Regions:
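Short, positively charged, Gly/Tyr-enriched micro-motifs
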Residues: 1-59, 64-70, 106-108
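Active-site beta-loop-alpha junctions of metal-dependent nucleic acid enzymes
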Residues: 41, 89-113
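A short, conserved beta-strand element enriched in hydrophobic/aromatic residues
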Residues: 76-96
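Helix-centered, glycine/charged polyanion-binding patches within enzymatic domains
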Residues: 122-179
């Protein structure tokens, strides 16, 4: 029960704080490194529910940001839909076409349908790899101020604010939990836990308690 409780706490709290709760509640003395080991061993078996979007037009936002791995700058790539759901995230050493392609290919498999509009920054790799989200996916550059856009005879006001706000959340999460990773594997594991945490918080805010409970049960039934 100590390990199970530690994993649930670590999804929401820094590893250095979790041992304090374990000691107060169970008088169990464990190190923060042990908590991290437990999470790495068991929590990554948690599978997020299948992505489901019933909207006629699916709009996604994509962006990348810096993150440190072994003291060197790498890139955290994220894609989310227009409803605030994080679809996928990866961390790679380079800000290039291959990384963008990997993100969008894996995202397309998770989405299970074509994306209609991809809102992005000026990185050319997105333009070249947008086809992996669907043959007819429209790749559109938009900044914080936004701009008008016509798609299938309908007017849309598009902005890349959702990506910028997500990057701010990632920065806060990194500052709170970890700002440098030992290797690329641990960095991507951390990105997966970030997605899990975001999904759980969204489930709870939308009162989808059964879905949140199912994910937490996965965390403790190992």
């Amino acid at each position: 029960i100590v390990i199970r409780f530690a994993i649930i706490l670590h999804i929401f709290l820094p590893s250095r704080i979790v041992p304090l709760f374990l000691f107060l509640l169970f008088r169990a003395k464990v190190s923060y490194k042990t908590v991290c080991d437990w999470t790495n061993k068991f929590a990554n078996g948690i599978v997020l529910p299948e992505y489901n979007c019933a909207a006629d037009i699916l709009i996604c936002h994509v962006d990348e940001k810096y993150v440190k791995v072994k003291g060197e700058w790498h890139y955290w790539w994220s894609i989310k839909d227009c409803f605030g759901n994080i679809i996928h995230a990866i961390i790679t050493p380079f800000r290039d076409y291959d990384s963008a392609k990997k993100l969008l290919q894996e995202s397309r498999r998770r989405i299970g349908r074509d994306v209609d509009i991809l809102i992005r920054d000026g990185l050319n790799a997105y333009q070249r790899s947008a086809k992996f989200l669907g043959r007819k996916c429209r790749s559109v550059i938009a900044g914080i101020k936004g701009k008008g856009f016509i798609y299938k005879k309908k007017f849309y006001w598009i902005t890349n604010n959702p990506s910028e706000s997500l990057n701010s959340e990632i920065d806060f999460y990194l500052a709170k939990f970890q700002n440098n990773f030992a290797n690329l594997e641990s960095a991507n594991r951390f990105a997966n836990l970030f997605m899990l945490r975001k999904h759980l918080k969204k489930c709870l805010s939308e009162k989808k308690l059964s879905e949140a409970s199912s994910l937490l049960i996965q965390a403790i039934n190992f």
